């Protein structure tokens, strides 16, 4: 660690003098670590990079832990301040009307090779909590764990692995934060009926053939299934927390039944029925109002906010393909069906030919053609929002 500031200062000075990076490194070893062989020099540089990487992780955890202290979460520009401003101006009804046709769509697109692997993300989360609690013993242990944990995988991740890494953000960041935003809006807006579609999450990994040519149909289906399973796990955890508070006779048993239903679906022992799940939660809400003076209804409403946001799909898989590949596929299909290329829109819409599923023998073409059909398969399990953009 003591050589890092020395190396940093040395590099800055030599770069200012016009030396090349290769010259700078060679001169540094001559002046400060003379006598080391090439392998020892490589080991030293590797440890420098390793040390700096972990410093960056520590800074990330520190920033997360101190965010609420460094930023006024209720100040100017925040959602709560905006809603107060709307209320004071008497514009809540107008805002409600505008939100009927307004939605934002955050799309997770970046390849997770740019992010930390899941085990490092878990350490950052625990380290952040320990810093917030000022638990020095835990901080020290997590830093030791971080020092022994590789930050990058030695083997290239599969498209499914990449999707799993990004799903971590859905599960641990977006599920909570998007739900909190919706709950804040619900508490502030008049005549809220739970149907506003304020936030729609998009998801490219597993469906993006343009960005990752190794994506195939089985990957798309796997990712869609994983999105649904992880979402059900989030619902299950929320239900367990609900049951700790809502311990009243009758309603407690209702929550137990819902929890068992979700758990069976997670284990693939029972088919997921969103309508049944949604209705059961509303029954719990109604019983709390009618039989228990509305105690803890806010907790149920917060879960219903998330159910309205994420449904059965969590995020919509965007099926993407290079337009040239799509043209190749349709040219091959037209040739297979014996259809001439339409010259006018009228001729195009008048076509009655239908693909019977016969494959061409070209993997890319067949995958492109079958990707249109897989959308319906995903929609049948994850509702239409599960995959509705090509």
Where are these regions (language model features)?
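Acidic (Asp/Glu)-rich catalytic clusters
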Residues: 375-383
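Core AdoMet radical
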Residues: 356-357
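Often metal-dependent polyanion-binding catalytic scaffolds in large enzymes
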Residues: 1-349, 360-367, 386-389
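Well-ordered, non-membrane alpha-helical segments in soluble/globular domains
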Residues: 368-375
């Amino acid at each position: 660690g003591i050589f890092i500031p020395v190396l940093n200062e040395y590099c800055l000075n030599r770069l200012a003098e016009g030396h090349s990076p290769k010259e700078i490194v060679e001169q540094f070893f001559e002046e400060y670590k003379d006598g080391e062989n090439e392998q020892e020099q490589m080991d030293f540089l590797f440890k420098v990079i390793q040390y700096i990487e972990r410093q960056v992780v520590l800074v990330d955890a520190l920033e997360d832990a101190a965010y609420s202290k460094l930023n006024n979460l209720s100040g100017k520009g925040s959602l709560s301040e905006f809603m107060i401003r709307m209320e004071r101006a008497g514009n809540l009804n107008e805002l409600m009307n505008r939100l009927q046709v307004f939605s934002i769509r955050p799309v997770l697109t970046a390849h997770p090779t740019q992010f930390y692997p899941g085990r490092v993300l878990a350490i950052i989360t625990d380290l952040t909590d320990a810093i917030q609690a000022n638990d020095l013993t835990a901080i020290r242990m997590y830093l030791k764990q971080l020092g022994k944990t590789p930050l990058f995988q030695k083997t290239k991740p599969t498209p499914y692995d990449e999707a799993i890494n990004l799903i971590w953000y859905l599960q641990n960041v977006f599920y909570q934060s998007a739900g909190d935003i919706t709950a804040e809006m619900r508490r502030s807006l008049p005549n809220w009926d739970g149907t506003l579609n304020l936030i729609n999450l998009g998801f490219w990994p597993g469906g993006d053939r343009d960005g990752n040519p190794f994506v195939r149909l089985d990957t798309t289906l796997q990712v869609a299934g994983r999105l649904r399973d992880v979402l059900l796990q989030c619902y299950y955890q929320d239900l367990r927390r609900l049951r700790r508070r809502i311990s009243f006779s009758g309603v407690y048993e209702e929550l137990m039944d819902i929890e068992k239903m979700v758990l069976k679906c997670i284990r693939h022992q029972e088919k997921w029925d969103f309508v049944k799940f949604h209705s059961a939660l509303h029954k719990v809400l109604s019983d709390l109002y009618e039989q228990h003076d509305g105690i803890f209804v806010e907790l149920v409403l917060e879960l219903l906010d998330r159910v309205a946001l994420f449904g059965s799909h969590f995020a919509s898989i965007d099926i993407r393909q290079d337009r040239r590949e799509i043209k190749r596929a349709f040219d091959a299909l037209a040739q297979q069906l014996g259809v001439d290329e339409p010259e006018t829109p009228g001729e195009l819409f008048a076509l009655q030919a239908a693909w019977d599923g016969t494959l061409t023998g070209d993997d890319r073409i067949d995958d492109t053609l079958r990707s249109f059909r897989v959308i319906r398969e995903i929609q049948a399990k994850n509702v239409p929002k599960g995959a509705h953009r090509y």
